[in-house]
């Protein structure tokens, strides 16, 4: 019996040791400066495998970013997402290591970048750390991993990045590389505890790596006499700069920046490299964006530049959609809008990729529309992530605010928060994806937020101030009526989601509020335009547009509204999207395109920038970024109003195509829906309207001929999957 008991105790001890060996720990370097901002460190681990496994999933999380090499091969380029699925938790990656593993000896190396400061899209835990859990092969991060803080990585001097960016300006001192101060790592937490909170699986794919491309450069000088090597990039992109140089001495400071180093009138990311003697290759791993990459160094330097290159990375989706039409200006706009969209997608949606990298929800709604009509469905995950983050950051009092995730911003923009949950936000996402699960998840947050909105004695939406009562850039903003229109659209969205998710008991209250808002809103009609009695500025074109797109204005007012909009141009590129939509809905697509070309003409014609501005000119209001997410909204208007394409049953089970008569006489588009690619082309020959429609399996399209056209007296028809050639003839008045 004693022998049996001893054996049992021994087996328990072995089991405990095995279990302990399989525990993954948050680890960090044993260095007193490990939690300073912009700290870089490396972690190494050698291990042996008896055979090569077929599949090994490693769960990896970090504060803040990591690069992973397995047996010398790069397995992950800039892994990890900026922290903040909610206020306390962290995202983790799932990485398949099997393509890089082999029988026998293996080694892994992790390079960690710790931001160490807050930003408008990142929450710092306050502790640099990484955790790796591939327990199926016995590979877990613990004290057996060797690590060191890399002293070659430093921070550039002033000017520093502005307060919105968690990223710092990286300086790399090449003569300090190759250090060997490796020590056992510190174990400072386990999975799901400590400063990093619970761990949520990464909801979007790893970045697409387009590879390193050698670039042509021009040589010039700046006004200080420095050599400036300028690379004209194919377009405004997210990229990491690379170069190959020889320095006959050492200590030359090579500055690395783009034409967006002061994007939006504030300090953005840049980098420096301090040479060692001899030939050296370097890639600056902090991504930056721009149309022009610049490498700058003193004219006195004994430096030979062998090559300059760059690695473009970005959100992993495809430009599956296409569009071309008979109007070259619109084609050029479309290209710029797509570049503006894509460069504003990474960890989250951005308003701009240089100054802020922040997920403002007014911008997100504009980006969402473009994404659904032109990017592959893999992009939908970024929308879903944005939606989840918005509701998971909801304050205890019910307030929704953006940008999120954020550690140094918590102010509500009431108009943008209403936009996010409106028919242009959450419900719009549902119609394009059919994702009922997400709607069920967000509805309680929608209901809580809407409960904060009250009506005044006249029955109109009360002016909720929030933290920043912003309705649009520019002047003459009739804020009471803008809020009322967004409130109305948010209530309509809430009705839709409530009915979808089994909360019908809430619907009657929403409908009563909508009726009250509509009645009170229309009391503000003066016979020519909508104006709130307390507003004393010029009549606001934004309000007239919102009255139309929300349905608050009936068609009897359209001509007066049209006349008012023709005389007012106060909307910024953000709200101008809704102005064009309103004009098209009222049957004035010709003027919408005329106004569009007038107001967007400068930025479309600009050959220096491949993206669209924040304001109406470079350096305008809001900081004057030359790349801003909200300026591509006309792309969605063209799809939905001129081409007349939109889903009518969630998930594109059914769709409508009702083209408008417009100055665009010929066009073709491919829309990569969740059902497959919907293709539509038309040619307007005056008396004949020809259309070709290719419909994917599982979708029904209801085609309505342009006004004034018919086929054998038929104006409408329902079409199933397949390719359809249609010819309509102009009808006599």
Residue ranges of each PLM-predicted region?
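Bacterial Sec-dependent N-terminal signal peptides
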Residues: 1-22
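Extracellular/oxidizing-compartment recognition motifs
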Residues: 22-354, 363, 378-384, 401-408, ...
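Alpha-helix capping and helix-loop boundary segments enriched in small/acidic/polar residues
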Residues: 32-35, 82-86, 96, 122, ...
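Aromatic-rich carbohydrate-recognition surfaces in CAZymes
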Residues: 99, 108-112, 119, 272-304, ...
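Repeat-solenoid scaffold signature
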Residues: 110-129, 136, 569-598, 607
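Non-catalytic C-terminal accessory modules of carbohydrate-active enzymes
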Residues: 157-158, 162-172, 590, 594-733
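The feature captures the catalytic groove of carbohydrate-active enzymes
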Residues: 267-271, 277-278, 346-348, 352, ...
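Extended, well-ordered alpha-helical scaffold segments
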Residues: 333-336, 379-390, 436-453, 494, ...
């Amino acid at each position: 019996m004693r022998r049996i008991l001893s054996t049992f105790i021994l087996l328990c001890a072995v089991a405990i040791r095995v279990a302990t060996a399989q525990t993954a720990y948050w680890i960090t370097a044993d260095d007193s400066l490990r939690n300073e901002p912009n700290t870089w460190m490396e972690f190494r681990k050698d291990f042996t495998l008896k055979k090569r496994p077929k599949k090994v999933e490693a769960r990896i999380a970090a504060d803040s970013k990591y690069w992973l090499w397995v047996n010398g091969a790069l397995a992950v380029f800039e892994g990890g997402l900026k922290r903040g699925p909610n206020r306390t938790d962290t995202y983790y990656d799932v990485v398949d290591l099997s393509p890089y593993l082999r029988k026998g000896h293996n080694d892994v190396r992790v390079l960690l970048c710790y931001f160490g400061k807050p930003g408008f899209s990142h929450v710092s835990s306050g502790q640099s750390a990484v955790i790796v859990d591939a327990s199926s092969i016995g590979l877990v991060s613990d004290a057996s991993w060797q690590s060191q803080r890399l002293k070659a990585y430093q921070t550039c001097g002033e000017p520093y990045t502005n307060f919105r960016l968690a990223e710092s300006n990286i300086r790399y001192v090449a003569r300090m590389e190759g250090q060997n101060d490796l020590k056992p790592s510190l174990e400072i937490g386990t999975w799901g505890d400590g400063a990093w909170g619970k761990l949520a699986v990464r909801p979007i794919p790893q970045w697409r790596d387009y590879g390193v491309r050698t670039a042509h450069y021009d040589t010039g000088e700046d006004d200080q006499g420095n050599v400036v090597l300028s690379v004209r990039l194919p377009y405004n992109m997210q990229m990491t700069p690379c170069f190959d140089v020889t320095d006959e001495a050492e200590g030359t400071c090579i500055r690395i920046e783009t034409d967006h180093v002061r994007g939006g009138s504030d300090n953005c990311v840049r980098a420096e490299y301090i040479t060692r003697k001899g030939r050296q290759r370097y890639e600056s791993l902090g991504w930056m964006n721009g149309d022009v990459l610049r490498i700058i160094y003193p004219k006195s330097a004994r430096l030979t530049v062998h090559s300059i290159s760059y690695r473009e990375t970005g959100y992993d989706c495809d430009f599956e959609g296409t569009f071309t039409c008979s109007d070259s200006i619109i084609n050029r706009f479309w290209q710029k809008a797509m570049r503006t969209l894509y460069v504003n997608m990474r960890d989250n949606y951005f308003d701009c990729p240089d100054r802020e990298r922040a997920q403002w929800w007014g911008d997100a709604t504009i980006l969402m529309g473009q994404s659904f009509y032109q990017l592959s469905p893999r992009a939908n995950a970024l929308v879903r992530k944005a939606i989840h983050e918005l509701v998971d950051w909801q304050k205890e009092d019910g307030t929704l605010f953006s940008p999120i995730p954020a550690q140094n911003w918590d102010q509500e923009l009431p108009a943008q928060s209403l936009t996010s949950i409106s028919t242009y936000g959450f419900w719009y996402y549902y119609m394009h994806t059919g994702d009922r699960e997400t709607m069920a998840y967000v509805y309680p947050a929608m209901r809580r937020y809407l409960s904060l909105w009250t009506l005044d004695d006249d029955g109109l939406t009360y002016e909720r101030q929030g933290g920043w009562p912003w309705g649009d850039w520019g002047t003459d903003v009739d804020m009471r009526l803008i809020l009322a229109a967004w409130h109305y659209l948010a209530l309509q969205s809430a009705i839709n989601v409530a009915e979808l998710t089994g909360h019908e008991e809430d619907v009657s209250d929403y409908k009563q509020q909508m009726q009250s808002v509509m009645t009170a809103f229309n009391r503000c009609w003066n016979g020519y335009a909508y104006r709130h009695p307390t507003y004393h500025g010029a009549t606001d074109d934004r309000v007239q547009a919102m009255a139309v797109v929300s349905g608050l204005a009936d068609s009897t007012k359209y001509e007066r509204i049209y006349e008012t909009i023709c005389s007012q141009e106060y909307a910024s590129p953000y709200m101008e999207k809704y102005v064009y939509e309103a004009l098209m809905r009222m049957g004035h697509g010709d003027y919408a395109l005329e106004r569009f070309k007038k107001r967007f003409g400068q930025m479309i014609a600009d050959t220096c920038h491949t993206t669209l501005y924040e304001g109406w000119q470079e350096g305008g209001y809001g900081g004057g970024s030359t790349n801003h997410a909200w300026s591509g909204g006309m792309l969605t208007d063209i799809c939905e109003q001129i081409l007349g394409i939109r889903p009518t049953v969630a998930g594109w089970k059914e769709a409508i195509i009702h083209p408008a008569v417009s100055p665009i006489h010929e066009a073709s588009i491919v829309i990569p829906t969740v059902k497959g690619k919907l293709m539509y082309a038309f040619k307007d020959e005056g008396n004949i309207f020809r259309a070709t429609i290719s419909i994917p399996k599982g979708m029904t399209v209801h085609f309505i001929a342009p006004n004034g056209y018919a086929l054998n007296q038929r104006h409408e028809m329902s079409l199933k999957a397949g390719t359809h050639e249609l010819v309509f003839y102009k009808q006599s008045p």
